[in-house]
């Protein structure tokens, strides 16, 4: 399997875009801007509060307005940890990933996930 075969494709395409954005803790400005632009470009109500939380609201699909609201929450930063012998600048470098068997792995083993 290669990265282009990961499903659902739209999720992994978005994941690849996010991996291009350096976002160590306390320095999430680029990620905040990316998410803000993402919401606004889709015509969604988008705001950033005074502490840097990005809130994107999507109206219910027609016919589902009576159902409970769904909230998705996540942190924007990443844990900046790597092997000692790996050169990686968490303030500047994009995360490069590849598929290793059943694992999506970052070069330098700075992260991995079962696929």
Show which residues each predicted segment covers:
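Active-site metal-coordination/substrate-binding segment of hydrolases
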Residues: 64-112
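A non-catalytic alpha/beta surface segment that caps or lines the substrate-entry region
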Residues: 24-68
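Short glycine-centered, acidic/aromatic-flanked micro-motifs in structured strand/loop junctions
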Residues: 21-23, 58, 74, 108
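N-terminal capping segment at the start of a domain
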Residues: 2-26
């Amino acid at each position: 399997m290669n990265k282009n075969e990961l499903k659902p494709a739209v999720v992994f395409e978005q994941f690849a875009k996010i991996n291009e954005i350096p976002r160590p803790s306390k320095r999430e400005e680029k990620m905040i801007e990316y998410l803000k632009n993402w919401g606004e470009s889709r015509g969604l109500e988008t705001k950033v509060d005074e502490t840097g939380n990005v809130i994107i609201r999507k109206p219910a699909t027609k016919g589902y307005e009576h159902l409970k609201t769904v909230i998705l929450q996540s942190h924007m930063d990443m844990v900046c940890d790597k092997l000692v012998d790996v050169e990686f600048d968490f303030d500047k470098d994009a995360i490069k990933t590849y598929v290793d068997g059943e694992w999506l792995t970052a070069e330098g083993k700075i992260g991995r996930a079962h696929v």
